[in-house]
Design a protein with these regions (language model features):
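A short, well-ordered alpha-helix in the C-terminal region of glycosyltransferases
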Residues: 190, 327, 334, 341-355, ...
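Nucleotide-activated donor-binding/catalytic signature segment of Leloir-type glycosyltransferases, i.e.
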Residues: 245-261
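Short His-centered aromatic/hydrophobic patch
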Residues: 92-98, 116
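Conserved acidic donor-binding segment of nucleotide-sugar-dependent glycosyltransferases
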Residues: 313-314, 318-325, 334-339
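Helix-loop-beta element that forms the nucleotide-linked donor phosphate-binding surface
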Residues: 55-59, 155-176, 181
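Short hydrophobic beta-strand element within catalytic cores of glycosyltransferases
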Residues: 43-44, 298-301, 311
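Aromatic "clamp/platform" in nucleotide-sugar-dependent glycosyltransferases that forms part
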Residues: 262, 281
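A conserved mid-protein helix/loop that constitutes part of the nucleotide-sugar donor-binding site
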Residues: 20-28, 199, 203-225, 239-245, ...
Length: 378
């Protein structure tokens, strides 16, 4: 193993350069790491906005193109990268990134941390797929020096499914300086065609099966037909773009829904909505959800692993069951009709997040893990 130096050189590995929850976590982690102690280097398997932001921060970034887990073709490139950059420790974010780093770290005797942003197995998969994913997660976890789960529920699920060991929980955090509801924001309602009196429900997430965008659209449609001033803001892109665009066109929603691809002005977007909706099928602990809570927004979400730990029904948000369009539409209507309840839930959500989920605290906790692993000889 490469000798330990005063400043620890850590390779942060992630599957994609586009910004999702894991990528937001990594951006904040690197931003708040003490650069006097840790020198982060990033490896992503695709390009994207995250890479551009990290580069502007002065972080050395590498892109090795791969769309597959356990990709044999990229192993040699990863080994050379680790050697050339004199990497001492690897933190792999997510299962695909971890699967592609297993052989290189083992060959080079580099300690590995696996940060779980949500397991790759979930209930909507077939029995065989779920079993195979559980098996692959077990292989990854058994090869890591330390597993970091971003929610207690993720840890419990791992223990239940494949006997997870050597795991600690460091909950996701939010950059509370950036996501401050009392800050100054660009007024976007006029840009999106909304009036001040419109009641805006926001979906700001990747356009993928995981986030369940069609359920959001169906619920918004029902809500709008009951209360025409209920309108929607849909921001995000992904492999369901075609299905989403087709649904919007077929159901003639353009008059009350603004659809946008990925945007970087998330605090401004959150500032302009009344309710944040996240009907996901699975989550670790959604950073987007925490950001909306930090911006003092009323929340409607499904009871995924991490969400169950932060949203208490009718206290700091509303919880609806998976794929339940009528219940989601009803919840939107509840917040529309009961503004006092909406504001109370929003205030409680803000209070909960600001007291517990600070991204600076996350970086300090992760940095402590880095030091402990190196001090224990990897």
């Amino acid at each position: 193993m490469i000798g330990y130096m005063a400043k620890l050189k850590v390779l942060e590995v992630i599957r994609q350069g586009q910004i999702g929850g894991g990528e937001s976590h990594l951006l904040d982690l690197i931003y708040f790491l003490d650069r006097e102690k840790v020198e982060p280097v990033c490896l992503s398997f695709t390009d994207g906005e995250m890479i551009r932001r990290l580069t502007r921060m002065g972080i050395v970034c590498h892109i090795i193109n791969s769309q597959k887990p356990f990709d044999i073709k990229v192993q040699g490139q990863i080994i050379k990268l680790i050697q050339n950059e004199h990497i001492q420790l690897v933190n792999a974010h997510g299962s695909r990134a971890a699967s592609n780093i297993l052989y290189p770290v083992r060959k080079l005797h580099i300690p590995l941390i696996y940060t779980v942003h949500g397991w790759s197995f979930h209930d909507d998969q077939s029995y065989i797929v779920r079993k195979l994913r559980g098996w692959s997660e077990k292989i990854i976890c058994s090869s890591a020096n330390q597993i970091i789960c971003v929610s207690e529920s993720n840890k419990v699920t791992g223990i239940k499914v494949f006997g997870l060991k050597n795991a600690i929980v460091i909950e996701n955090g939010v950059n509370l300086d950036k996501f401050n509801p009392d800050g100054s924001f660009k007024y976007l309602r006029s840009e999106f065609g909304f009036s001040e009196s419109d009641f805006i429900v926001g979906f700001i997430a990747r356009c993928t099966k995981q986030k369940n965008p069609l359920v959001f659209l169906a619920a918004l449609e029902k809500s709008h037909h009951v209360h025409p001033s209920i309108k929607g803001l849909f921001v995000g892109e992904g492999d369901m773009d075609g299905e989403v665009d087709a649904y919007i066109q077929q159901h003639q929603m353009k008059g009350y829904l603004f659809r946008s691809s990925f945007r970087t002005d998330v605090p401004d977007l959150l500032h302009c909505i009344d309710v944040y909706c996240l009907p996901s099928l699975w989550e670790g602990l959604s950073i987007a959800l925490l950001e909306a809570m930090a911006m003092r927004k009323a929340i409607i979400a499904t009871p995924t692993d991490g969400t169950k730990e932060v949203i208490e029904h009718q206290k700091n948000g509303l919880v609806v069951q998976f794929d339940d369009v009528p219940a989601l539409a009803k919840s939107i209507g509840v917040f529309y009709e009961n503004k006092v309840m909406k504001e109370e839930c929003a205030n409680q959500a803000w209070k909960f997040v600001t007291e517990r989920f600070n991204a600076k605290r996350v970086a300090e906790s992760v940095s402590t893990i880095y030091s402990e692993i190196m001090n224990n000889g990897g």
